[in-house]
Amino acid sequence: MKNLQQRGHLLTEQVNPNSHNLDQLSSLELVDLFNQEDKQTLKAIASSRLQLAQAVDMTTKALSQGGKLFYVGAGTSGRLGVLDAAECPPTFCTSPELVQGIIAGGANALLRSSEDLEDSWEDGNEAIASHNITNLDVIVGITAGGTTPYVHGALEGAKQRAAKTIFITCVPVEQFSIKVDVDIRLLVGPELLSGSTRLKAGTVTKMALNILSTGVMVRLGKVYGNRMIDVAIKNSKLRDRALRIIEDLTELSRDEAEELLNKSGDSVKLALLMHWSNLKKEEGDRVLSEYQGNLRAAMKNVSFSTE
């Protein structure tokens, strides 16, 4: 690793020539400048499309074989990983263990700045050991500037356990190189406020994590068309969404959809299979289990298919 005390060469630390007069702009000019600069995030995602697709495929394979997905980061990068992981259970009805976020400083760092904790390579390495990482798992190291010791300690620990590794950063390989399975470079350029990587770097990182986690869940069969058929029904909003999905896909009335959802044990996926195949709940559960929860695959192998 390069000398961590000298980071001025990194793209994320450089001065943005478009914002040299940032403190003299009107509020509207500030908004317009942010809007203009944020367009770089879309370009960065487009430039990394092949690597992102590779990450989706590799992670899908790992999770389908019993592995887990771990995001590791410090500061903003760590919080974004925790955020994405926390959204998977309600969106895709996954267990909290399937996708996890590991942040330097633990839960306290989610609420209070803990920048000093990112400098410990050993803490990152120990975090991997404490989570019992195996060769079935995928570790995503997230560091906007590329050099965070905590993240590199975690990645090294992952490699020692033969886990798959993904690196997400906002600096080019010429400025910082690393050996991982998938290397994703989201080059959004210098920040409007020099060095404040919670801005464009944070935005583009969230976009990449959105693509990774959602892409994996789509590939695992937790989506039918563009419908959230594995939604965990935990409140009235999500129950309404579940009922609307059933209504839209089956043309049942609201009351009929409610009855079907109740019979399925509040599983949209199972409710749809029961309706389309005339299977009872127990048999539907068995069929879905046989096809690893993939509704479309199950429907191709039962009678009364809608295909």
Swiss-Prot record:
Organism expressing this protein natively: Trichodesmium erythraeum (strain IMS101)
InterPro entries: Etherase_MurQ (IPR005488), Glucokinase_regulatory_CS (IPR005486), MURQ/GCKR (IPR040190), SIS_dom (IPR001347), SIS_dom_sf (IPR046348)
GO biological process: amino sugar catabolic process; N-acetylmuramic acid catabolic process; peptidoglycan turnover
Full protein name: N-acetylmuramic acid 6-phosphate etherase
CDD domains referenced in this protein's UniProt entry, alphabetically: SIS_Etherase (cd05007)
Catalysed reaction equations from the record: N-acetyl-D-muramate 6-phosphate + H2O = N-acetyl-D-glucosamine 6-phosphate + (R)-lactate
Residue ranges occupied by any SIS domain in the UniProt entry: 59-222
Enzyme class per UniProt: lyase
Gene: murQ
EC number annotated for this UniProt entry: 4.2.1.126
Family: Belongs to the GCKR-like family. MurNAc-6-P etherase subfamily.
